[in-house]
A protein has these predicted regions:
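Nucleotide-activated chemistry modules centered on ATP-dependent adenylation/adenylyltransferase
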Residues: 1-246
């Protein structure tokens, strides 16, 4: 059977952990290449390699590998304008109820998808996957973004999006499924300082605002910068910053 290679976004948490397991146990015999992203506001990104190691030890290097931590600050900053320079009344007029926390998640997750597309091109993968769940109170994980916009973005790059745990709505069952696979449910998830889920159910105006910003600002900027073209990979795919010596 042909090996189907997947770029999997691995945060180190239990959702992306289980996503890796489900892909590897799938009848399609996926081969996964795990990657972690650091947006510049995260702690503990380097610890995620310990989670990847647990997966590799069980399934073997032929099926699973870890590409490391990639810095995506240079992608995310492209999407800050015009939001950061808008007055509150302007923000509400143009982008309805989009909160700062949902804005942060929007630009960050989009940056992850772009870098995943670059990695897929570089690693000759056909799929991109993540551990997003629709019940986690982030607009980027609701159907309008995950199933529609991000799926379309990935498809535009001639790739396919896989969401192995998207319909899972019970942490108890998630942990039990990991236990049945022989894993203790302790992980080393990185901590984002600006990622903040909605306190209650997500208001439709928040969803509409996130969709509007993506449609009107982010997607046109992605195309303007040719981020989905294969030549871009040669220029921008880097997993560290240079450092000045003393």
């Amino acid at each position: 059977m042909e090996t189907k290679t997947v770029i999997l976004m691995l945060s180190g948490g239990r959702d992306s952990f289980l996503a890796a397991c489900r892909l590897l146990d799938d009848k399609n015999q996926y081969k996964i290449k795990m990657v972690t992203y650091d947006n510049g506001c995260s702690y503990g990104s380097e610890n995620v390699s310990k989670v990847a190691k647990r997966i590799i030890e069980k399934y073997g290097f032929e099926r699973a590998s870890y590409l490391g931590v990639y810095r995506i600050g240079g992608i995310i900053r492209e999407f800050f304008s015009p939001y950061f320079n808008m007055k509150p009344d302007e923000q509400v007029k143009r982008y309805k109820g989009m909160t700062p926390s949902q804005f942060h998640c929007l630009v960050c997750r989009t940056g992850m998808y772009i870098c995943s597309i670059w990695l897929a091109m570089s690693e000759h993968a056909s799929y991109i996957a993540e551990g997003g769940r629709k019940d986690q109170k982030f607009v980027v994980e609701l159907p309008g973004m995950a199933l529609e916009r991000y799926s379309a973005l990935v498809k535009e790059a001639d790739l396919e999006l896989l969401l192995p745990v998207y319909e899972l709505n019970d942490n108890w069952e998630r942990d039990n499924e990991l236990l049945r696979r022989g894993y203790i449910c302790k992980t080393m998830e990185q901590k984002c300082l600006i990622g903040f889920p909605a306190k209650d159910s997500i208001d439709q105006t928040v969803i509409d605002g996130v969709h509007a910003y993506y449609d009107e600002v982010i997607l046109p900027r992605i195309r303007e910068l040719h981020f989905l073209e294969s030549d871009t990979v040669l220029c921008y795919l880097e997993n560290k910053y240079d450092e000045f010596s003393k």
